[in-house]
């Protein structure tokens, strides 16, 4: 009888682990990851551009991921993303230059200049309004 109870508890723990993994943003992102060099090229191109700045260990970044994915998919947007937690992307001078001191942050660039930003966790409707407001995609 004890074996059945232990087996049952192990199965419950496994099911909970799988649920947590699936519900915490394991879905494939609809944004395109870039590095610091590509970020600079995107800004310098002077074309209208949305760039999402995040960290993989940031809880609000994990929370916003499904919301952002939903809007990108629905609106058929092209969004670049920079994970500043990756060693190659962490540069304090760069972060200071672009005033990137909070994640998640979605930036809108036009003519090589930042025109708007959305910082912190936001709902899908708030994200959609941000993209619509900066609509020349």
UniProtKB/Swiss-Prot annotation:
Q: Which GO terms describe its molecular function?
A: protein-disulfide reductase activity
User: Entry's Gene3D superfamilies?
Assistant: Glutaredoxin
The signal peptide, as residue positions, is 1-25
Q: Which Pfam families match?
A: Thioredoxin
GO annotations of cellular component type: cytoplasm; cytosol; extracellular region
Assigned keywords, A-Z: Disulfide bond, Oxidoreductase, Redox-active center, Secreted, Signal
Q: What is its main location?
A: secreted
Which family does the similarity line name?
Answer: Belongs to the thioredoxin family.
Q: What is this protein called?
A: SPbeta prophage-derived disulfide bond formation protein A
């Amino acid at each position: 009888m004890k074996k059945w109870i232990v087996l049952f508890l192990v199965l419950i723990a496994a099911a909970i682990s799988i649920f947590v993994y699936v519900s915490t943003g394991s879905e494939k992102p609809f944004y395109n990851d870039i590095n610091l060099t590509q970020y600079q090229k995107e800004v310098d191109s002077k074309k209208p551009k949305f760039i999402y700045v995040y960290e993989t260990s940031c809880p609000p970044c994990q929370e916003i991921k499904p919301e952002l994915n939903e809007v990108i998919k629905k609106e058929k947007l092209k969004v670049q993303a920079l994970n500043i937690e990756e060693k190659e992307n962490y540069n304090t001078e760069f972060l200071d230059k672009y005033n990137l001191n909070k994640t998640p942050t979605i930036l809108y660039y036009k003519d090589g200049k930042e025109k708007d930003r959305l910082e912190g966790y936001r709902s899908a409707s708030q994200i959609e309004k941000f993209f619509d407001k900066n609509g020349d995609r």
